[in-house]
Design a protein with these regions (language model features):
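Ser/Thr/Pro-rich low-complexity tracts
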Residues: 485-596
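Extended, compositionally biased non-globular segments
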Residues: 237-239, 244, 251-405
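Short, composition-biased motifs enriched in small/polar/acidic residues
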Residues: 405-485
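Hydrophobic h-region of N-terminal signal peptides that target proteins for export
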Residues: 7-16
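A glycine-anchored, Pro-Gly-centered beta-turn/N-cap motif
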Residues: 190, 354, 429, 472, ...
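Extracellular-facing segments of soluble proteins and assemblies that are Gly/Ser/Thr-biased and enriched
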Residues: 116, 124-229, 233-239, 245-247
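Solvent-exposed N-terminal domain segments of exported/luminal and surface proteins
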Residues: 17-173, 180
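Sec-dependent signal peptide recognition
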Residues: 1-7
């Protein structure tokens, strides 16, 4: 139980360190919520628990950042990875008639970022974001930040996930139909994440975004830009990411505000100096890609309606590599603002002495453009990532069930004498409110005041108190808290899921097995029509290397998938999840196949 005195007003000063003060924490004691359909989005119908049999949020979970601690070298935080705004809905087709197969669930993530960012030595050596960590950083509302790819790449005539090719599918171009109004969606584990322009967060932070109250959708404001974008998140290399607006001159805060101009153009021949892969074919990677991938060369599919320009990240050329006129290349800082990593060196309101910083990349029309938030190579050394503090740390913030309620000064209505008491509250909490005239004897006004729903404050009115009591003190005590998800009660059902059966159910290392995979037609998200071929078939296991089928097909009459796997001699033994992917969606069977 917690007690607070209503007549005490506490003002919390902003911390001088933006790595601490930039996090959005005021909503952490409010339940995360979703819309399931467009109609519910318009009517503002929300849910605090949800299920589609594949992913279940069985109890309410608090939104976003739940704790922040720090040491000399690290910022540590815990997040549910659920947005503080209402998330959803998500669809799987442009007509928005088929619900997306995945729903977000509490991830209970512990993460850290370095307090000091360092650059690689030599500076041209950059590490890829395509590693074991899926999140390349986190937004300040606690939502995961992903690189611009969707996990698929082209190699050997097919697209696979996780792919090993050098032509990486661009997420915004291929998955945007599955994004919610905040430009965000979730993978098959329920991890809510953003690849491009976190517009709902930008609205919360006042970053030149308008909300349509009728449709509950967001759009870039049409008014003049008047202030620098805020910090939207932090990347694993310790650098901030800002919204799209910065100072016109990178080192002059008095130079005006404008949209940052990205450094990439499509390889369609429309810009002076750029090639046209429609006519030449995808015979070569752009210079920025080979410069960062270790000079690996690879060709891709011919441009077509199936593989249009923009489908792959490598369909974009970096202006700094192109000839603008004669022998002169386009110049960073003159022709464009952001380098090939989507980074600029500049002063910002939080860093008046200058910093390297990522920026959200938008077109003049406000549309995300590659590389959107970040490229898939880190600019700095990516020393941060998933971690729990194993050193002595200092608490900066505690949220959710551990938040300390704070009281506001009582408000007196002089016409009626009513006194309104307001305090920050925890959703799901029950409060006892007491009053006294002398701080010695207390009378109970209520023992059952429920915290306001979908709010961060709760109020109670004592009628006529001003006229009855010349002096009045109040105190509030939280006496109960409803059950909530602390990170251990969210479920991802196994057994019969998107796949109903696998045959055979096991195979030996060092051999080749052919699996017959029957999709579950009764699953909440029906499988694609039988004549639609899968894009990849994989076997996955935590801590083990993914095993990818090189040859697979689907019977166009029955819909049964056949996939051949070569089980490596050194493969990790044990149970694997079988995954059949069709574009951005995956149908799975947990523990469906055992490697002996």
């Amino acid at each position: 139980m917690r007690t607070l005195a209503i007549f005490i007003f506490t003002a919390v000063a902003a911390h001088a360190d933006p790595q601490l003060s930039s996090w959005v924490t005021e909503y952490s004691s409010k339940y995360a919520r979703i819309h399931r359909t467009d109609a519910e989005r318009v009517s503002n119908t929300t849910y605090t628990t949800w299920t589609n049999t594949r992913l279940t949020q069985a109890l309410p979970a608090y939104a976003g950042i739940q704790s922040i601690t720090y040491s000399d070298n690290w910022i540590y935080f815990n997040t549910t990875d659920l947005g503080p705004y209402t998330m959803g809905p998500w669809y799987d087709n442009a007509a928005r008639t088929i619900e997306f197969v995945n729903l977000p669930v509490n991830q209970n993530i512990n993460y850290r970022i370095p307090r000091t960012s360092t650059l690689a030595t030599p500076p041209t050596t950059k590490s890829s974001m395509k590693g074991p960590e899926d999140a390349v950083g986190f937004f300040v509302d606690g939502v995961a930040l992903y690189d611009p790819t969707d996990g698929f790449s082209y190699s050997g005539g097919t697209e696979a996930s996780p792919g090993t090719g050098q032509w990486h599918r661009e997420a915004y171009a291929n998955e945007a139909i599955t994004f919610d109004a905040g430009n965000t969606h979730q993978q098959n584990t329920g991890k809510y994440h953003n690849h491009a322009n976190p517009i709902a967060l930008r609205y919360l932070l006042g970053d030149h975004i308008d909300l349509n109250p009728t449709t509950n959708t967001y759009a870039e404001s049409t008014s003049a830009v008047t202030k620098h974008s805020p910090i939207l998140g932090w990347i694993r290399d310790g650098l901030p990411i800002y919204g799209p607006y910065g100072y016109s001159s990178p080192l002059d805060p008095n130079s005006g505000i404008r949209r940052m101009v990205g450094g990439f153009v499509k390889r369609n021949g429309a810009t002076t100096g750029v090639d046209n892969i429609t006519t030449t074919g995808r015979t070569a990677l752009p210079a920025w890609a080979t410069r960062n991938n270790g000079n690996i060369a690879a060709s891709g599919p011919a441009v077509s309606t199936t593989y249009p320009i923009g489908r792959y990240c490598e369909d974009w050329a970096y202006l700094g590599d192109l000839i603008k006129s004669g022998s002169t290349k386009y110049q960073l800082g003159t022709d464009f603002d952001l380098n090939e990593y989507n980074v600029r060196y500049c002063v910002t309101p939080e860093f008046p002495n200058g910093t390297y910083a990522y920026f959200v990349n938008l077109t003049a029309a406000g549309v995300p453009q590659f590389p959107c938030n970040t490229n898939f190579y880190f600019f700095g050394n990516a020393t941060g990532g998933t971690a729990t503090a194993s050193e002595t740390v200092t608490d900066y913030f505690k949220g959710g069930a551990n938040v300390q309620e704070i009281a506001s000064p009582p408000v007196v209505d002089t016409a009626t004498g009513n006194v309104t008491l307001t305090w920050s509250s925890i959703e799901g909490g029950t409060y006892q409110v007491e009053a006294s005239t002398d701080l010695a004897v207390w009378s109970t006004l209520t023992t059952t005041k429920a915290a306001a729903s979908n709010a961060i404050d709760t109020s109670l009115v004592e009628p006529g108190a001003q006229a009855t009591y010349p002096k009045r003190f109040y105190r509030v005590k939280r006496t109960a808290l409803a059950s909530y998800d602390n990170g251990t009660t969210t479920t991802t059902p196994g057994g019969s899921e998107g796949i109903s059966s696998i045959s055979p159910a096991s195979g030996n290392r060092g051999t080749t097995v052919t699996l017959t995979i029957t999709l579950n037609n009764s699953y909440s998200m029906a499988p694609p029509p039988a004549n639609v071929a899968p894009t990849s078939i994989t076997l996955t296991k935590n801590g083990a290397t993914t095993i990818t089928s090189a040859t697979y097909s689907r019977n166009s009459s029955t819909g049964v998938v056949t996939a051949s796997f070569t089980l490596p001699a050194g493969a990790t033994v044990g149970s694997y999840t079988v995954n059949a992917s069709f574009g951005p969606n995956t149908w799975s069977l947990t523990n469906g196949f055992t490697v002996n």
